Amino acid sequence: MTKEQKLQLAEIRTMIPEMRRVECIHFVGIGGAGMSGIAEVLLNEGYHISGSDMAENTVTVRLAQKGAEIFFGHQASNVAKASVVVVSTAIDPSNPEIVAAKENRIPVIRRAEMLAELMRYRHGIAVAGTHGKTTTTALTTQIYSEAGLDPTFVNGGLVKNAGTNARLGSSRFLIAEADESDASFLHLQPMVSIVTNIEADHMDTYGGDFETLKQTFIDFLHNLPFYGQAVMCVDDPVVRELLPQVSRQVITYGFSDDADVRLINYRQVGQQSFFTVQRKDRTDLDIVLNIPGKHNALNATAAIAVATEEDVEDEAILTALLNFEGAGRRFDQLGEFETGNGSAMLVDDYGHHPTEVDVTIKAARAGWAEKRLVMIFQPHRYSRTRDLYDDFANVLDNVDVLIMLDVYSAGETPIAGADGRALCRTIRGRGKIDPVFVPTIEALPPVLANIIQEGDLILTQGAGDVGKLAKQLASMELNIETMKKLG
């Protein structure tokens, strides 16, 4: 970091003089993607950071190397030095660290409240929506970085070009993923808000009422100052429906004829996307985006719309998108590997909603039409499987071979008829494909060994621990005997 950048950073920190009274910030569940990002930014700002989690992972290792104090397991003594305790909604209120903090009158705040403090005196760009948040945040970060704007960013997944999910920049810009799953994005007060799309998800947060979810997005947009900007995907029917209710400047984007920033002439060749972006009063941009799928072209167009308003030079936009390496676990190509039955391509994807699974399948088909598509799908949460059961069945039978794992519960209690086995039976009953149910990841390798063929595209899909399986498969010699031994 240059001397000038250090001075800019010092200036940013002095904008929040009251925060200087905070000596130690403790994170309960520090190993999670959203929590670790904020922790890393604060650590780099010079705060003492401590945190706890149940097990070590790559994130906790990195934070420890940077100077954070990491505890494994949750106990009251972990918060002894804390000036404030940061929690996510995934943490049970009976957690001993939360109980101890409250008993000792240590403030306990939600993750989004701390993110809001980071954003308070910066030019915040918040990326919201049911799908595409992580990739759009990464794309916007890539463009701003290429333009030399050195943004701070906090993302829900790895920004591959940066090698991390969060970084402290020296400029006034902060680009952050805004989480609607617990409505905590209402704490944020950005200057620019992107809304990629709105669908029914996390409905328990909203009392099962879709109208409440829609109103929450409107409230989020009205956290913008009157001079702020809402960048909204007009292709999404719910977003379009809400446009008249948004009392801030709106910039629309999408394939639609009436979009302010319009995407045309899309085509995909292998992993790359080619398209043109038309902008009012600006020259058209012929884009080469280094990730596949129409959905990612839309995500890139959102980032272009924001960058255009900031007068980022076109060359920086073009270069950033051409060199974009993607976001972690978003159509993550882990390479070709050799098996006893031949060579196969391995792709890992985080998508766990029917819409996300659908666009991933379409991207795979568009780029690798000649390959047999073998999906290993792990449903995420019983409630989501129940609420979107028919949608999952409609989407999942569009692959050639489906291997179904049981539900990754994420702490939920099982719901009868909303599990992997039931979903498998429903899909089989339609007669299009004959899915294979495998109850656990540990039982999968020998099953997979008997299924893989030369030229297959193997897609591990889901938000649970199926991603760990993908890394395991990518890191070993996948001969048949090895896989059978794994079983």
Swiss-Prot record:
GO BP: cell division; cell wall organization; peptidoglycan biosynthetic process; regulation of cell shape
TM annotation in the entry: none
Gene Ontology CC terms, in alphabetical order: cytoplasm
This enzyme catalyses: UDP-N-acetyl-alpha-D-muramate + L-alanine + ATP = UDP-N-acetyl-alpha-D-muramoyl-L-alanine + ADP + phosphate + H(+)
Functional pathway: Cell wall biogenesis; peptidoglycan biosynthesis
Tell me the residue numbers annotated for binding ATP.
129-135
Q: Which Pfam families match?
A: Mur_ligase, Mur_ligase_C, Mur_ligase_M
Q: Tell me the superkingdom of the source.
A: Bacteria
Localization per Swiss-Prot or TrEMBL: Cytoplasm
Please give the PANTHER family that the UniProt record associates with this protein: UDP-N-ACETYLMURAMATE--L-ALANINE LIGASE (PTHR43445:SF3), UDP-N-ACETYLMURAMATE--L-ALANINE LIGASE-RELATED (PTHR43445)
This protein's name: UDP-N-acetylmuramate--L-alanine ligase
In its UniProt entry, the species of origin is given as: Aliivibrio fischeri (strain ATCC 700601 / ES114)
UniProt lists the gene as: murC
